[in-house]
């Protein structure tokens, strides 16, 4: 039936900050839903706390609220905006849980708001493990044997019936949070305890093991008329036991017989009917026993998910857009498939004539203490997808798109002749880790058979055969050498997905030599279109992937084109903020009449949506792949400064190959990154940097360190997200760092900087045009002291404590730097402001990045200035004056950005903040005062306000003076103080009464016992030096485990304590209302 006319306003809840298990795929689905519903004439209200999303742009919905996603705040928005319906299926687990809370607290009933897209009962039945199991039994589908436990005793009792290994899955959590696999009683007690604490309903499912079974997912869409289509069948290369978000997955499914496929198809449709999902997309996961063929249903998600984003990109069928329209009453046969230009209806099941492989990207290098074994709890931070005509081609393209330094199935570096290394290899095959695929390659190099590898890994023999064949192709080529490379052989190897770089490695030459030979032999890729119908109908949509065949379907135009290189897979330090900038560049330049070409390989993002740009190449971001596209399309300009470090690393090589890089020149980018050249510029401009030196070997480092004095910040040059950066407090620390970390630098030296203690860090984003005019986008004052990575620090716009004179000085310096570097486009600068003995502010320049930075979306939302769009137009040749963007906007309200961390996912990782970036996402809070804005941001970040009770204070000596006002404020608020001996004596001397408690090393009962007993409600704990950090580690870890609010910097504690009075108060404002104030 046609769309409903009784609904006028629809509220969409977004997914909040990016966390492990819930990344930018929900920005993609939410943005699509907003577009789809507004196209149908509905008024759309959106709430999402994450400013780095496209969906929170003011033009995406009629009212956009960047507010905390909890039922109390959403109730205020409902009261104000009076929506008729709430669509909760676009914002992942966060939105579903919030919708259930609103229903349970009677808010939906009170304001007469209807849930569309998924009914309350359907969400309940799908999410509640016990209800789901019963429902499956009623329709004759098998689930793994399991029972629900609400206490540890119940869990131990159930275990006796299901046996070890036991799988534990908490209800209503995201990405398998708190779950795991227990092989013995001790592990069971640990995992169940954690699971019960993380589950909002305090229940866990204790389930029989189906480890080693094959895992499949079906993406299903169903409408009110009971039309059902399977958009895509996805097969996990990794067997059951690895969370599907951490598995390598392949579409379409490769190893199902036709009969098995029909069985899964019928079963998944039966599941949707039983659960009652009648308008939209769901994903159903199955396990199949490789020995008996028994099929079990693992779970279903009654919403758009990570897998549906993958299925949408893999097939070209926009699941979220279709699901949004079904939610307002359309049926599938009434909707047109856009990718075929409307030639087919949406009820036409997609069929694909290529293979898609997704490989997850991990960040264990950021969390050395974490357990890198993959289990049922998701640990990856991003993913990459590749398409090819065969599984081998798409697998190898995906491997080089991961950007982990691999260029194919690279050897792991094990000595395959040694017994110890072979034993290690077998362990790696058995216990899955992030590198398992490379160990599979090594197993075949060592002469193991497919049967041997299967017995250890349970990866289906079909996949193992494919990988074995790739290894034998490698070995033959290495034996034959370059002379044997004629056109037929090279074409065969390229069809199997080998990169030029990997071929060069195998025959002992360089990538350029292989490229020259390949071009001479006329072995070039062609581009095929993704059309959702296996080329049955012509498609007008230019959504392309490369392969080595005969017919090219690219058909490039001769319009003026600009190509934007995306950021590749999400990782810590390079996330959705960079994708946001790429999307803005594409939208702005398209409006200006350019044909826009996007190159990217991340399936979760808005940039890889086929209608964000005019042409989309879904390709790895390597020099080889980019050069081939440039050659075919001949763009007027290529933008490399928007995708983070990924495209920047290619800038020099692209320029050397004659590619027109627009914006800031690769030479200026290099000048800003090269320490010695940059030092000269700073001296010439008369600016100050912290005293620094460059050391090229270990001994030199120790000598130079004495010249500067400790503490020092040490790091390798050319890194993003502060990789391998550390603060060292003495010689033994530095010696250890130089011994362990210099391996990081590729023939590049280590940088030593004097660490500025107790300085305030400031970020400034600016745009410069080709005439050298500069627009200041925003000045942000960090809340945590210098020394915490800027991506991990909270910040405030406008600054909340810096004097007007200091701010003017910062602006003056930034303008000089932009001119000195000849910046065209965006530039981000970081300063530290330190008070000298005379009480004056001294400004030190920390670093300059002549590219888009991760603060661009936040600044754009806070000031209403679309910085990435303005800068893209500057790069394409427009001036700031022509765009009417010449004056800085300083709002009279405060916006605070707060970072979100994944520490709860990684047992054993210390949650202390430092110079290495470890946050995965961000939230934003707005208020009339700094305290109010900070309180909103804390609430949005899920950081709970400590209830009255005992506050524990333990700080390093230099912080004792500064912690006094914080301690006083706590006492005035009604908290009682608890402190360790040193800090306690200091507080008592200054007239504050406090209870003294033992440090862990001083014997029991000590502070950690108090935390475990629930006696402590808030913790302020600062430390310096490695020894003190590791002594106090258990305090921070237990705080995290027992959900006690804690601060690891004095400035953070001060802001938190002063913001307590604002918690939960104040009205809600939409961005549209805030930005209107700025125009006045």
Curated annotation (Swiss-Prot):
Large subunit of the glutamine-dependent carbamoyl phosphate synthetase (CPSase). CPSase catalyzes the formation of carbamoyl phosphate from the ammonia moiety of glutamine, carbonate, and phosphate donated by ATP, constituting the first step of 2 biosynthetic pathways, one leading to arginine and/or urea and the other to pyrimidine nucleotides. Mn(2+) 3 binds at residues 830, 847. Residues 555-942 are annotated as: Carbamoyl phosphate synthetic domain. The large subunit is composed of 2 ATP-grasp domains that are involved in binding the 2 ATP molecules needed for carbamoyl phosphate synthesis. The N-terminal ATP-grasp domain (referred to as the carboxyphosphate synthetic component) catalyzes the ATP-dependent phosphorylation of hydrogencarbonate to carboxyphosphate and the subsequent nucleophilic attack by ammonia to form a carbamate intermediate. Residues 404-554 are annotated as: Oligomerization domain. GO terms for molecular function: ATP binding; carbamoyl-phosphate synthase (ammonia) activity; carbamoyl-phosphate synthase (glutamine-hydrolyzing) activity; metal ion binding. Keywords: Amino-acid biosynthesis, Arginine biosynthesis, ATP-binding, Ligase, Magnesium, Manganese, Metal-binding, Nucleotide-binding, Pyrimidine biosynthesis, Repeat. ATP 1 binds at residues 129, 169, 175-176, 208, 210, 215, 241-243, 285, 299. Binds 4 Mg(2+) or Mn(2+) ions per subunit. Mg(2+) 3 binds at residues 830, 847. GO terms for cellular component: cytoplasm. Residues 133-328, 679-876 form the ATP-grasp domain. PROSITE patterns: ATP_GRASP, CPSASE_1, CPSASE_2, MGS. This is Carbamoyl phosphate synthase large chain. Mn(2+) 4 binds at residues 847, 849. Belongs to the CarB family. NCBIfam families: CPSaseII_lrg, PRK05294.1, PRK12815.1. Mn(2+) 2 binds at residues 299, 301. Its EC number is 6.3.4.16, 6.3.5.5. It comes from the Bacteria. Residues 1-403 are annotated as: Carboxyphosphate synthetic domain. It catalyses: hydrogencarbonate + L-glutamine + 2 ATP + H2O = carbamoyl phosphate + L-glutamate + 2 ADP + phosphate + 2 H(+). Residues 943-1080 form the MGS-like domain. Pathway: Amino-acid biosynthesis; L-arginine biosynthesis; carbamoyl phosphate from bicarbonate: step 1/1; Pyrimidine metabolism; UMP biosynthesis via de novo pathway; (S)-dihydroorotate from bicarbonate: step 1/3. Mg(2+) 1 binds at residues 285, 299. The gene is carB. Residues 943-1080 are annotated as: Allosteric domain.
